[in-house]
Amino acid sequence: MALKGLDIFKLSPKKNCKECGSPTCMAFCMKVAQGAVSLDKCPYFSEEALATLNSATAPLMKTISVGEHKLGGETVLFRHEKTLVNKNLYAVNVCTCMDEATVDAKLADLQKVDYERIGERMYVEFVFVGNNQADPAVYAELVKKAAATGRSLVLECWDVECAKAALEVCGKDVILDGATPDNWEAMNALATAKGVALGVWAENISDLYDTVKKLEAAGNKNLVLDVTGKTAKETLANADLVRRTAIKDGDRSFGYPSIVNVAKLAKGDAHLQTAYASMFTEKYASIIVMETMTMAQALPLYGLRQNIFTDPQK
């Protein structure tokens, strides 16, 4: 919720001490409302006032930290409205359905995309590790291999026992993408115990919303929403609805970063996956999962991302 300067001034200490660098408390509060300075410049706000103001001014979309990466935290739909805050990140998928040689080749290839463009490192930030096995040891071994790349992980696993085994062999730079309307309680308990972000997926957007509400009621707001649908059209509609519901309608239950798996939407078609990835770079994926990331794919995607997430105010 956007507060006006007068709203903030009503809760201010009204000392006019000038310690913040502004001539009056009213001037300071106007700057806070404009986003020019932060509240912590004034040491005299009461704890109660700070709690009220921080709650009211918190972004409608939460920032979720995964290791060194920050996801979400956006305050606008489009860059020209103000600026976009945290760039989307790319992942390459491996799965227990793949043979060992394929997995090894994919993990080796993703590490070859690592270069600098205009002072920014361009590389594959995540490995997306899928599971179609009932054997926890098999999945844990694959996760261990993926973790050895040094990249953060997204663990797509809906089996609680397999997820437990996987989390034992990797660090905390992980999203456990495993909560569904059927298993959310068990997955929530596991993610909370391990201190990792929990990914949430459902067959449709209504069930996704209901599951998020249940997780929030259980005390978990360290969430990422997997909005991947059956088609690219459905997925784009999901991503757009989730972002607009949070930013425009002010509904914080959809105010979380999102995952889009273009590897599922265009399986085996690298060109179409790249096209889809560019679309979801613009609207509105926080993590985009692909089957591969070659230099031919990376150069246009990372260039596009850097252009979109450059602050137009600077």
Residue map of PLM features:
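Non-heme iron-sulfur electron-transfer modules
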Residues: A2-K4, M30-L60, I64
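Ferredoxin-like iron-sulfur electron-transfer modules
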Residues: L3-K15
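Surface-exposed amphipathic alpha-helical tracts and adjacent flexible/coil segments at the periphery
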Residues: K10, A51-H80, V85, L89-T96, ...
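Structural signal for hydrophobic packing residues in well-ordered secondary-structure cores
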Residues: S12, V32-V37, L107-I118, A146-G150, ...
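Local cysteine-cluster metal-coordination motifs and their immediate loop/turn environment
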Residues: P13-K31, D40-Y44
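Flexible, glycine/charged-enriched surface loops at secondary-structure junctions
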Residues: K41-C42, E116-V127, N222, D249-Y256
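Active-site beta->alpha loop and helix N-cap motifs at the rims of alpha/beta catalytic domains
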Residues: A58-D210
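Catalytic alpha/beta core domains of metabolic enzymes, predominantly
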Residues: D182-K314
